[in-house]
Amino acid sequence: MTELEIFNLIMIFFIIVGAGIFILLFFVSAPYGQHIRKGWGPNINNKLGWFIMEIPTVVIYLVIYLIGERKTTMMSIIFLIIWMVHYGQRTFIFPFLIRAKQPMPVTIIIFGLTFNGINTYLQARWVYKLSQPYPNDWLLSPFFIIGLFIFISGFIINLHSDRIIRNLRKPGETEYKIPYGGMFRWVSCP
């Protein structure tokens, strides 16, 4: 079996598992944040848990980039920068800004670690080995320009939304609060 065949099987597996989890989450609340409860195994500090969940996104991507055959092309370097900006922030900055005191179940950490590890392999291996090489003129293609615009918009929205959530409670408050403002205007339901 070739690596591309294994890659495609993992993609099919991800689609099937993703659809199953999507349906399951209509009936079961994932046990973190306000929904944390007993029965999901031991808990650890949520900052450490988030860091552990996200670290594969940086390490695996960087390793695949470094062993990849296309690491010196301009597009490969740009993809590396885009990935590292997003996941560097999610791994090394976001967890340490979390104000919530609730612990995180190790089970959730294992699920996140597994997803992030496999997803990072799929993304990096595609870019640096399995796809056709991205030529430098692809930088000016509508696909890249639109994709970069979506990424930058999403990154800014993500940072802003994280800030709103961090500032929901005043020091000493513990009750659940519904976020509002920014994009929460479209997704929150009181």
Model-derived segments and spans:
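Membrane-anchoring alpha-helices and their flanking helix-loop junctions
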Residues: M1-R185
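Kinked, hydrophobic transmembrane alpha-helices enriched for aromatic residues
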Residues: V187-P190
